Amino acid sequence: MQTLVEQIVYISDMFGTAVFAFSGVLVAGRLRMDGFGVMVLAAVTAIGGGTIRDMILGATPVFWVRDPLYIWVVIATALIGMWMVKLPRRMPWYVLPVADAFGLALFTVIGAQKALNFGTSGLIAVLMGTMTGVAGGMIRDVLAREVPMVLQKEIYATACILGGILYTLSLEVGVDRVSAMLISMLGVFGLRVAAIYWHLSLPTFSLQRN
């Protein structure tokens, strides 16, 4: 039987899955894909990172095979998303980025904790948390023939890395798991929202040609 905290994390995980899936729907709509294309981009965005994480860790069957509700959430989000984008009234621009920041924070913590459950080091936990948060979006962008956002100057993967470090260090110094999750999520969410609001970005590397 799940504890209250585990239930809250599970419900939040489903919310994050829906948010990530909806971002895939928006990209597919911008590229004028058919219904199948919408489903594919929604799915890879929402569950791609966690799938790669589970395969690397040897956590098979992967999470959405063990719990098909993730797939149903993706399908429902894709169908609702295709209907919503046709509505005359648009949602405020900041709703999706802020919701995405929450999903990113949660996915980072879930990925890091799952790695720790498999006995990995803190470094690997940080990498797995980051992968859970960003790999799905990278696959989506590659399929859309775009440069993945995490490879540009956006503060996105950096926020995941920060969150993973905060989580593993908090556990290392004796902070309880719930508090460590909150500290990590606040770090990821706060940095990502600050980057959106103040247009913060990382310096870029440019090779000058003579």
From Swiss-Prot:
KW Protein biosynthesis (keyword) present: no
Domain of life of the native organism: Bacteria
InterPro entries with a match to the protein in the record: Gly_transporter
Annotated membrane topology: Multi-pass membrane protein
GO terms for cellular component: plasma membrane
Annotated keywords: Cell membrane, Membrane, Transmembrane, Transmembrane helix
S-S bonds: none
Transmembrane segments: 8-28, 36-56, 68-88, 91-111, 119-139, 155-175
Predominant cellular place of this UniProt entry's protein: membrane
Keyword Lipid biosynthesis: no
Cell compartments where the protein resides: Cell membrane
Family of this protein: Belongs to the UPF0126 family.
Protein name (Swiss-Prot/TrEMBL): UPF0126 membrane protein
Lineage: Bacteria, Pseudomonadati, Pseudomonadota, Gammaproteobacteria, Aeromonadales
Gene that specifies this protein: yadS
